[in-house]
Amino acid sequence: MSIMGLLSSEQLNQLKLVLDTLSKNQLIWLSGYLLGLVNSQTSTDIGVTASGVSAGLELKPDLIDNTIIVISASQTGNARNIAKQLYSDLVEAGLRAVLFSAGEYKFKKISEISLLIFITSTHGEGEPPEEALALYKYLFSEKALRMEKTSFIVLSLGDRSYEYFAKAGKDFDKRFEDLGANRLYDRVDLDVDFQSEVDKWKEKVVSLCKSKIVSIVSKDKCINIQNNIVFKKKNPVTSYCKEFPLIAYLLNRQKITSCNSLKDVHHLEFDISGSGLCYQPGDALGIWYENDYNLVYELLELLNLTGRESVQIKNQSMCLDEALVKYCDLTQNTPVVVKSIATISQDKILLNLLQNQNQLNSFCSTTPIVEMFYQISMTKQLSSQELIQILRPMRPRFYSIASAQSEVGEEIHITVSVVRYTINGRIRSGGASSYLVDRVQDHDEIRIFVESNDNFRLPKDPNVSIIMIGAGTGIAPFRSFMQQRALDKALGKNWLFFGNLKFTDDFLYQIEWKTYFKSGILNKIDTAWSRDQDYKVYVQDKLLSNGLELWDWIQKGAYIYVCGDAKYMARDVEQALVTVVSIHGNMNMDQSNDFWNEMRVQHRYQRDIY
């Protein structure tokens, strides 16, 4: 749609008269002001992405050469936020730039880009973020086109605590080069505490881009680009984020597994009254938790520290115990932590572990930090500041939102499975899950923010059918989906596949699902209970046994949604889906994999995995 199709001639003339009087900085300010107005109107038919440009944007061929394409591949929002910052800096520098998420960009056209800046995080065991999977598979296929005309820059985010640090970015970087693209700047790999390094990187990138693209955008060129923008509806956003969370309050917490269950799962409701916080089905809730004081003082005693020592964190002085409660990850051990402690302590157990990566990884996954100090001898006193520098910075935990805002109003719901296990007779718990279930009380304050997930959205057309596949707490977003579909009076059919341990103990939200089924809103439900018989039954088995009908739904346009564990459940479910299409769609396995990749591109196959 062109501007002429949106504004009358009189409106366009009045707008041009005003714009001609504005400086570049005034235009930049105005663009942000107008974006805010658009985002505050939920009923508008026109909107833009958070970057200020539209999704699905295609530039005319004569504009591509002098346009910087910024693509972000994000799992929890970090890469996307950096891309937005860079985009703003490029525009402020007078450069023509367009921002996309990896899921928005028509990846087969990537070889036509003149200047590409690619910013990605790493997910799981070195995989790219979910929204970048289709692009990743295309680039590493024989179908990928050469990229000789493309100059590129890659920024890769990761966590040095893990074996596959920044691997997704490294993979993209090497593949761009293998396809003939020209490196404009060496890849930069950043750890979890990245902001200061990001600022330096952005400054360098803007300088390089200004040198690469001599022509600075004029007002006329700005108008030409706007003529190519396709506007789309966008829901409102708020200013709450990881750095500036909302203070919410716990309204209700209810255990939703039986007392006999091997799992301890709870439904939590938070009060967000008056905050203006908005969310959609499919979004995630970020929660800043606090460590257990008992765990903190157990660790301090093992290290002969009092907790009253002064330490520096984020340029602030505070007592060590406060820093450990609020700013350090005490529950997840990592190879980097073990290596640091081994170097200082010279403990033989840890030094031997460093010689075998597999044994080191196994030790980290089974031995929490505090348990490690029970097992080793410290030949040197660890200082309070050394401890702070060794431990990973605390990061928020993310939970799939289990409510539709149009149903629950100024509340937000999540589903939490508490991590509990015993080591050497001592009970250990997960940091965030035990905080939410064991330590937070009704009406206590919780620091939260919404992480938008445009890669896990209901179909825009309510007449389209959906298939929901979840295991354990992976059922949470489907509760929000069904609340929304019921309110929308969606005519599309709904089919739920759900798996857990036992029917009598672990059927999460059972009454709600039965109510939806009896009312006809939920058309089909297939459950898999892995411990209810001598042999294991999982959701992927149910997919295979319902393969013919599943294929029929897919052929009729159904959207497929998967939520659950990334390492096992999501992998096995995808293999089952590939098998179903191969058998009932009369395809070989390669063709079936291509089919699901195309389903991803069409946003008909979406996953929320963790």
Swiss-Prot record:
UniProt-annotated binding residues for NADP(+): 530-531, 536-540, 572
Binding site for FAD: 331, 365, 397-400, 415-417, 421, 430-433, 610
GO BP annotation list: cysteine biosynthetic process; hydrogen sulfide biosynthetic process; sulfate assimilation
Organism superkingdom: Bacteria
Pfam annotation, one family: FAD_binding_1
Domain named FAD-binding FR-type: residues: 243-459
GO molecular function: flavin adenine dinucleotide binding; FMN binding; sulfite reductase (NADPH) activity
GO CC list: cytosol
Family from the record: Belongs to the NADPH-dependent sulphite reductase flavoprotein subunit CysJ family. In the N-terminal section; belongs to the flavodoxin family.
Subunit-level organization: Alpha(8)-beta(8). The alpha component is a flavoprotein, the beta component is a hemoprotein.
Protein role: Component of the sulfite reductase complex that catalyzes the 6-electron reduction of sulfite to sulfide. This is one of several activities required for the biosynthesis of L-cysteine from sulfate. The flavoprotein component catalyzes the electron flow from NADPH -> FAD -> FMN to the hemoprotein component.
Protein name: Sulfite reductase [NADPH] flavoprotein alpha-component
Source organism per UniProt: Blochmanniella floridana
GN (gene name): cysJ
